């Protein structure tokens, strides 16, 4: 795979020695729910913006880049560490739960040109994709991604495509029924969007198994033997020639770190992570119930510990994206 000099420059800005240790704080709908669980009434704009600022101030010195949204995160972009790169999201949060299509939608007041002008070093877009889903729906999704890829090509800025797999007939992605399908769903979507017509530079993906059902990782029911889980990671590596990074999917910091060791041992040559809730989630109840100062203390201690431990794991497990580009 080859990229332009400008795209390479931007990728270098969001990584450290080819490893992407990025902090994800583009959550909007999920963050509102987390905040609402600890107070009466909905979270305010000020509450959301302030927590994003706190996280950016305290944790970006230890991350190669931070992922933020232009809806609530622009203030946070102003206080990140100088050497830390910036990814901005282009998609609206959430999806229409009344239909199985989960069609994508851009933030209507933004374009790649405007996100770049706001300081982005890369653009991230999230797509829900069922590789076995309705053919017409998938054609619409593919065309949508082609448009975004073309925008990023025109602006000469890296395109990070986040793929979240699902099955149109299964409502619970954490179920045993979906766990059996997950390797095929995750790896199949990666294969589709690795085609150069989509203009994707880096894939942000799920691990291809639900670790809660892997032999040795669960005390409950097992749906993958160790050998089956290893094969799923090997198939993932074979599914794309593009650099790819893992998302934390809201699991605990400990499980995410253990997963990265397992993935690397299986042969997955991932180039880093975009890790969100596994790093900062514990700050939310502290911020809501005890205020800014206590939240800052949590971020400086437990938040720092989470990100520092993750960085150490990445040093041992991740492969530089420069090996693929």
From Swiss-Prot:
Biological process terms in GO annotation: 6-sulfoquinovose(1-) catabolic process; D-tagatose 6-phosphate catabolic process; lactose catabolic process via tagatose-6-phosphate
Enzyme class: lyase
InterPro entries per the UniProt record, alphabetical: Aldolase_TIM (IPR013785), DeoC/FbaB/LacD_aldolase (IPR002915), LacD_aldolase (IPR050552), Tag_1.6-dipho_adolase (IPR005927)
UniProt keyword terms in alphabetical order: Lactose metabolism, Lyase
Protein EC: 4.1.2.40
Pathway listed: Carbohydrate metabolism; D-tagatose 6-phosphate degradation; D-glyceraldehyde 3-phosphate and glycerone phosphate from D-tagatose 6-phosphate: step 2/2
PANTHER family noted in UniProt: SULFOFRUCTOSEPHOSPHATE ALDOLASE (PTHR39340:SF1)
Name assigned to this protein: Tagatose 1,6-diphosphate aldolase 1
Protein species of origin: Streptococcus pyogenes serotype M3 (strain ATCC BAA-595 / MGAS315)
